[in-house]
């Protein structure tokens, strides 16, 4: 890897990521993938792989700091979107705001957002446990 080559961390390793990895390579990026499944096919196309769950946002953040990445993304892997936003916020990288992604991924938060902003929405209530 050249010293000035930009690094992108891609969360996940499913086959859908292969064309994205190839496009990143064509743009000159050093591509790093991570998830907890080392045999996922897309890892073979990356320059580097790390065995870290994409839902462990703090572990991914530490990896991103260690690797000094220039960008992070989750493509076709919904659980990684929140982690990518978290890392972007913490490292000052371009991306979707963490709070916005939280609202969009949590139905109770999204319905509350709609209601607070004057949208027509059915009455609803979110629950966090069976006891509720």
Stretches found by the model and what they are:
Residues 1-100:
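ATP-binding N-terminal substructure of ATP-dependent carboxylate-amine bond-forming enzymes
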Residues 103-132:
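Active-site nucleotide/adenylate-binding loops and adjacent lid/helix of ATP-dependent enzymes
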